[in-house]
């Protein structure tokens, strides 16, 4: 009985050691911070052609979801890593327009709720890894906050926080949660670098550049070209499932 117990313990030890090989099949969770904005020569025109716009800084959001890693070489040097992530992206734009002798400033912040599906090729070199590949994103929600400041010629000014209703690029008024002026899907290229321990803990930094223009008012053929771009910093734990 004692010999059987020793053999069983030895087998379990070897199995765990193999399962913890960084090159084996893994599945787990990932999450972290997202810093996003818009890019493109026409990105500053998203509030409409009548406005002089200035894109704000990158907006802070977050991401969380499921990650996997499938080895495609026996030593684990190459692997494929599909993920399914919720990603809170967005942008900020400040617009100015003259109305008679008054200057109207509109500050608009827009939150974009995405489901991201990156499918990345990974090179695993010791704990260090590099990743590159495409990402498909589905926009399932949007929320707008807007503040209007009117500066009068006599030096007075008034600030109004509206209910989030806004006019899109083509001049159509939309509600704060309306996303019909935006493209529903995005295709992006992703590149990243990170470190993963043999036990499955990881820290990674990646950049995603969208290739499909975000603005799609569907009422004009002259929508400005503006593309999502985002940096993400992720912590993860991928449970080894063996090879």
Regions found by a protein language model. Give the residues of each.
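Transmembrane beta-strands of outer-membrane beta-barrel pores
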Residues: 33-37, 86-90, 125-127, 136-140, ...
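Membrane-embedded beta-strand positions of outer-membrane beta-barrel proteins
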Residues: 29-31, 80-84, 119, 130-132, ...
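Transmembrane beta-barrel domains of outer membrane proteins
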Residues: 67-71, 120-124, 194-196, 204, ...
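Repeated loop/turn-to-beta-strand initiation elements of outer-membrane beta-barrel proteins
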Residues: 76-78, 127-130, 199-205, 241-243
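Outer-membrane beta-barrel "beta-signal"
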Residues: 26, 227-243
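Sec-dependent N-terminal signal peptides
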Residues: 4-13
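Extracellular/periplasm-exposed beta-strand and loop segments of Gram-negative cell-envelope proteins
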Residues: 37-59, 89-113, 139-186, 211-232
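Sec/Tat signal peptide C-region and signal peptidase I cleavage site
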Residues: 15-19
């Amino acid at each position: 009985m004692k010999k059987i117990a020793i053999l069983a313990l030895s087998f379990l030890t070897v199995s765990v050691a193999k399962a913890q090989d960084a090159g084996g099949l893994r599945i787990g969770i990932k999450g972290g911070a997202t810093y996003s904005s818009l890019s493109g020569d026409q990105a500053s025109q998203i509030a409409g052609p009548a406005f002089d716009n200035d894109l704000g800084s990158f907006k802070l959001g977050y991401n969380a979801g499921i990650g996997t890693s499938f080895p495609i070489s026996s030593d684990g040097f190459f692997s494929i890593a599909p993920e399914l992530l919720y990603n809170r992206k967005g942008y900020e734009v400040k617009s100015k327009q003259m109305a008679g002798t008054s200057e109207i400033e509109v500050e608009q912040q827009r939150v974009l709720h995405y489901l991201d599906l990156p499918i990345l090729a990974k090179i695993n070199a010791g704990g260090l890894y590099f990743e590159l590949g495409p990402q498909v994103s589905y926009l399932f929600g949007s929320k707008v906050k807007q503040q209007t400041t009117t500066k009068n010629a006599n030096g007075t000014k008034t600030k109004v926080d509206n209910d989030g209703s806004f006019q899109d690029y083509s001049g159509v008024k939309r509600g704060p949660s309306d996303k019909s002026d935006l493209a529903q899907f995005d295709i992006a290229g992703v590149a990243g670098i990170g470190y993963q321990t043999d036990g499955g803990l990881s820290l990674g930094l990646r950049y995603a550049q969208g290739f499909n223009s975000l603005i799609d008012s569907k009422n004009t053929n002259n929508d400005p070209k503006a593309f999502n771009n985002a940096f993400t910093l992720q912590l993860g734990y991928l449970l080894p499932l063996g090879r």
